[in-house]
From Swiss-Prot:
Disulfide bonds: none annotated. Keywords: Developmental protein, Differentiation, Sexual differentiation, Spermatogenesis. GO terms for cellular component: Cul2-RING ubiquitin ligase complex; cytoplasm; protein serine/threonine phosphatase complex. Transmembrane segments: none annotated. One of its GO terms (molecular function) is protein phosphatase binding. Component of a complex containing fem-1, fem-2 and fem-3. Interacts with fem-1 and fem-2 (via N-terminus). Part of a E3 ubiquitin-protein ligase complex, at least composed of cul-2, elc-1, tra-1, fem-1, fem-2 and fem-3; mediates the ubiquitination and subsequent proteasomal degradation of tra-1. Interacts with sel-10. Interacts with tra-2. This is Sex-determination protein fem-3. One of its GO terms (biological process) is cell differentiation.
Amino acid sequence: MVPDDVEPMEVDDDGALIVDLNETVEEDEETKKEKKRRKRFREKLKRFDHYSQFSGISIAQIDWPLIQGRSLQRSPLTGQSFNADENIFRIDEWPRETFLQITSTLTFCAGAALLSNEKITLFVFQRTMKTLVAYCNFMYHRAITHNRRQINRIDVHELISRNPLRFHMFLQKFLPHPDINRTHFNNEFLYYFHNLYFQDETCRLLYHDVARYSPIINQQGTRMSLQHQIYYPDVMRNPAFDALWFTSFINPSGYSFSRFHAYRFHEALGMPPLESELIIVLDWLAKLIICDIGYKVLAWRDARGFQGLPDLLSFQMAMLEEGDPLFDLDIDYTAPPTRLFSEPTRFQTYPKFQPRRRIDFPSRFDGFYKKRRLERGLEEIQESFIMNHFPTKPLRTVYVYTHPEERRR
């Protein structure tokens, strides 16, 4: 007996099973798409590990799941605000040192270092990336609390509202001219904060409380400008360097947001699941972190009467007791990074140790044999010189005895 809930199979007149080829083709296409997604995810994960050699971010510091074969990013990472430049750059030829170059420019704009100080740049970049990952972890846990698996505008609001000064700066940055008649927005988070401004009176009061927050902002800006006027007067007067002040990780040129660099910055952060164009907010927070680090380093040196530009030790000592620069989160800056993909062990052979003699052996055997050939050639030249110029005076061996007994022997 066949149960009633089981559908009978379709067969033809000869009893052969009828198979719907359209369903098979659709399943094959879905399988191919899934394979492509997993392949792209593996490539992104390898690039994340490649960038982590500079950023110091490990998979143990990330709270959103990564080891599941595909990314959690569902919404488009970029939108109308970005310049479509994916075809201009090639991923396999794009150097990861670009992150350090941008960090060096931002540190230079903060007045805290020269453009060519690699150690300071690496220190600032690693501290900035670790702070951003901690912010993403905070927002991801908020999203999970609200039964969501993607960070959206509400989570950003909960993070930035922890600090009224930063929330004031955020509103002034992304809502420069609030207009109730505005209807077009490039992304959802601008639309959300635009409505919040007109619906929440507290938000409007915070937005217009310039007298309270401007002195704090101007204090940092004045100190950085003084540093530039003392050590970089040509940069301040040259209009060719105006784009430096607008440079960021997703805007390396200083003129427009780059979609290609936004994806690379997202991969370096560990691919957090973000709502569309929220990468702009993380990029803005990165600039704030670097500016805050630079200002605190300058203040630390001013308090001790140090002159000149800060060195690496000044950065390390100034940040020794500092925590989260923006939102007072509990961030551990001492955790050592771990690698996601272990590189194969490379065995390298070295020549055996040779004791030092009268003739110092070089580090490589090729140089040693060349030196021996030169010495032998020099000996042959000396012998031929003696034979040609002193043929009638052969050399005579003279024995010298120190005791008479040796002579008899």
